[in-house]
Structures are given as structure tokens and as C-alpha cells.
Regions:
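ATP-binding/phosphotransfer module of carbohydrate and carboxylate kinases, centering on a glycine-rich
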Residues: 1-57, 62-66, 70-107, 114-128, ...
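Short glycine-aspartate micro-motif
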Residues: 80-86, 138-140, 201-206, 214
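Short, acidic Gly/Pro/Ser/Thr-rich loop/turn segments
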Residues: 88-90, 146-148, 212-214
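Short, ordered coil/turn segments that flank beta-strands lining enzyme active or ligand-binding pockets
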Residues: 99-103, 148, 219-220
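Hydrophobic "anchor" residues
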Residues: 103-106, 152, 223-224
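Glycine-rich phosphate-binding loop and adjoining helix at the ATP-binding site
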Residues: 107-194, 200, 288-299
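Short glycine-rich anion-binding loops that position phosphate/pyrophosphate groups of nucleotides
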Residues: 144-146, 210-211, 283-284
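Glycine/GP-enriched mid-protein hinge/lid loop-to-helix segment characteristic of carbohydrate kinases
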Residues: 177-269
Length: 331
């Protein structure tokens, strides 16, 4: 049962969602966008203004008549820390930190390369970022492995395997909320939001040289994680080769790599029947994409074939977008 405080929080977040679009808004326009009464918007906007989350200013519209209060987000009020733990195709460990405003403006970017990237180094970098930006209100962490109840497993970075990463980061987060998940889940969520989907099913197939290929899916607006984050780990399907062999085969491309990618795509189509299958990473290029489309079209009746699309720029733009969208939901 939803109590009064829950309703109030939902109403507040509905107003925030409008404000996060940027620009200036009146109580009347926010009421129209949210379906809330003008009186409710007035009460909640006054609170947001007192807290410093929004700025309010009185204007005379068209220079005549009574003045009207106009509100916009205060970008200095809070920020979002996005931390990506990554491994490039040469095996270098990367720690990428981005600080975003609630309007998605990039306030700070940093990339650090490591020979060894363990839990202490990740925690140390987050501590450093919190000292530099004390208005950080939430922390998003993306990993190159699944998060099983706070423990990093199947990590592409060996020294982070079985790391109790969530507990370690909560220690340094100083009460700030943390959301942590497999990198591909952020990518697919960012792509889903970018496409404007709400009820559709989108699957991302991520193929990167020197790491195990995998998938991530969003169904009806919800990320599919499974019992402990293993959902989408197609590299553990019985392809007749080890995970190490799969990595080598996919890195080589055609013909064996293409065959494995097609099998993976067909398994996703058969199990999830998605509206769209998005290919990302640095293995599938436009030529290979055409071959994948041809092979899938031969195997699947046209009425069941999803839209097959190759992401621009390896799909990297969706990673940060997925983190930003998750941060908005954490309010």
C-alpha cells in the first residue's frame, strides 16, 4: 500500500523529471506536463527552491500583467559520478571517471591506465573524486564482469575476480547511494532510452577483441539481470569450444568468428524475440553486419526477424547515457 510519503516522493520526482529536461518552466506548465495540480506543484517547487535544487525567478510574460514565477534546475546543486572499470583490446586496465550534472552536462572527465587495477585503487579513485566534487549525490559503477550480490564475478580483469566491490565502495561513499552493474547493461539501457522505447524489447550483442562476447537486454523498460546477474552471458552456452577459444575465434573475425556471432544472434532471437538486436564493440563492422543480416534472414522467417542494427562508435555513447538514466531513477 502506498502511503502519503510515497505519493509525495513520486510527485516530487515527476516534477524533477520535467525540470531535468532543461530550460525554464512555470508552475502551470509543470502541472500540465505531470498531471499534478498547480497547488501541488507550487508547494513542491517552493521546497525545491528552498533546498537550492531549483532557481526561481519572477518575470512579466510579454512585459505586461502580473509577474509569473519561472523555474530552472540549479546545475551546481548536485552532480553524478560515473566510474567505468574497463579493459581495452591490448589488455590495459582503464578507470574512466565522468562527473555529470543533472542536465547531462559533462563537468569533468578523467581516464587513468593501470597495469594492475584492484579494489583498493578503485576505492581510492572514488575517494579522490568525492573530495574534488563534494556535491556528488550518487555513484554509478560499471564493471567488466557481473555483480552477484555485490561481488564481482567472471571479471575480465583477473585481480578483481571475487572482489567484494560493493561493500568496499560503500565504505568510501559516505552514505551516497551506489548503483553497480555489468557494463553491457548500461550500454543496452542507454540505447533503449535513446531510441525512446518504453514497452519494446532490445538486446545488445557486444563483441570486443580479447574479451568474451555477451549480451544484455531490456524488456518493457526493465533490464534483465536474472537471479544473480548472469542473464545474457552467451559465452557460456554450449558452442563446442571453451571461453578462451571463443575469444580467439571472435577476434579473428570471419569465417569462424562470424559463425559464432550468427549463432549467438539466432539464440537471442529464438529465446527473446526482440524488437531490435543492436551490435556493438570493435569486431562487427559494416561488411560483417551485412553477412550477419543475410545469415539471420535465411534462418528466421521474416515476420519474426528483429531490426538488426550496428551501433556507431562501438556503442560507447550508450554506456554513459545508461549511467545517466539510472542516476535519474535513483532520486
Amino acid at each position: 500500500m502506498i502511503d502519503t510519503s510515497d505519493v509525495r516522493k513520486m510527485n516530487m520526482n515527476a516534477i524533477r523529471a520535467v525540470m531535468w529536461r532543461g530550460g525554464e518552466h512555470t508552475k502551470q506548465s509543470i502541472a500540465a506536463d505531470t498531471g499534478l495540480s498547480v497547488a501541488t506543484c507550487n508547494t513542491l517547487l517552493n521546497e525545491l527552491e528552498r533546498n537550492g535544487e531549483v532557481h526561481g525567478q519572477k518575470y512579466q510574460l510579454n512585459g505586461v500583467g502580473r509577474s509569473t514565477s519561472v523555474y530552472q534546475i540549479n546545475e551546481d546543486y548536485e552532480s553524478i559520478l560515473c566510474v567505468r572499470i574497463d579493459l581495452d583490446s591490448e589488455g590495459n586496465r582503464l578507470l574512466l571517471c565522468d562527473v555529470l550534472s543533472m542536465l547531462r552536462s559533462t563537468l569533468y572527465q578523467e581516464q587513468t591506465q593501470f597495469t594492475i587495477l584492484d579494489m583498493d585503487r578503485v576505492a581510492g579513485k572514488i575517494t579522490e573524486m568525492l573530495e574534488k566534487f563534494p556535491n556528488i549525490s550518487c555513484i554509478l559503477v560499471g564493471t567488466s564482469g557481473i555483480i552477484d550480490h555485490g561481488v564481482l564475478r567472471l571479471s575480465d580483469i583477473p585481480e578483481l575476480e571475487e572482489a567484494h566491490l560493493l561493500d568496499a565502495l560503500r565504505t568510501v561513499a559516505q552514505q551516497r547511494p551506489i548503483y553497480m552493474t555489468y557494463d553491457c547493461q548500461y550500454r543496452v539501457y542507454g540505447a533503449y532510452k535513446d531510441a525512446g522505447y518504453t514497452s519494446e524489447t532490445l538486446t545488445l550483442l557486444f563483441c570486443m577483441r580479447n574479451v568474451l562476447a555477451g549480451t544484455a537486454s531490456v524488456i518493457g523498460g526493465r533490464i534483465v539481470s536474472g537471479k544473480n546477474g548472469f542473464a545474457g552471458m552467451t559465452g557460456y552456452m554450449p558452442w563446442g569450444m571453451s571461453q578462451e577459444e571463443q575469444i580467439q575465434v571472435i577476434a579473428q573475425g570471419s569465417p569462424k568468428g562470424l559463425e559464432l556471432i550468427v549463432k549467438t544472434a539466432l539464440s537471442v532471437i529464438a529465446v527473446l524475440n526482440p524488437d531490435e538486436l543492436l551490435f556493438a564493440g570493435n569486431v562487427v563492422d559494416r561488411e560483417m553486419m551485412e553477412a550477419v543480416q543475410t545469415a539471420c534472414a535465411k534462418a528466421v522467417p521474416p515476420e519474426f526477424l528483429p531490426k538488426l542494427r550496428l551501433a556507431d562508435h562501438r556503442g560507447d555513447q550508450y554506456y554513459l547515457e545508461g549511467m545517466y538514466q539510472k542516476a535519474l531513477e535513483m532520486k
